[in-house]
Amino acid sequence: SIVANYAYTHAAITKTATDSEKDFGMQRPNTPRNAFNIWSKYIIETGVLHNFGFGLGMNAVSKRYGQVGRRANTVVYPGYGLLNAALYYRLHKLQVQLNFDNIMNKIYWVGGYDKLRSFPGAPRNIKATVTYRF
């Protein structure tokens, strides 16, 4: 199976508490204009590797502004793309899964407000999940 999605978000400021026009039309802080995700998953149905599966995907976002306004020191967080993968094994109602996120160990920023309050993204990581369906 393949799942993909794209979102275009024009989250612009249309009104301010002080009616300051300098912020009108600016993209809301920490809101990417573009976001894209794709995930593909395949589970082997026959043969020696019966019930094993794998997945591969990526998620990407465009640049984001750290604060509102046309300020000289406005922080711009660059866009990024992350590559993710997974391995699966199903046995009747039980599934064991390993997810490998940010497999290229990319350094990126998920958002923030200014140079002192910026939030780094997660480094390469592995998650294990066991699921039992009743």
Range-by-range predicted roles:
Residues 1-68, 129-133:
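Gram-negative outer-membrane beta-barrel transporters
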Residues 59-69, 88-134:
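C-terminal beta-signal and adjacent terminal beta-strands/loops
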Residues 61, 72-82:
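Outer-membrane beta-barrel transmembrane domain signature
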Residues 76-80, 87, 119:
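Short amphipathic alpha-helix initiation/capping segments at coil-to-helix junctions
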Residues 32-36, 79-83, 122-126:
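Residues that define the transmembrane beta-barrel architecture of outer-membrane proteins
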Residues 5, 34-37, 73, 84, ...:
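Asparagine-centered polar/low-complexity signal
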Residues 18-26, 70-75, 113-120:
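Flexible, surface-exposed loop regions and adjacent strand-edge segments
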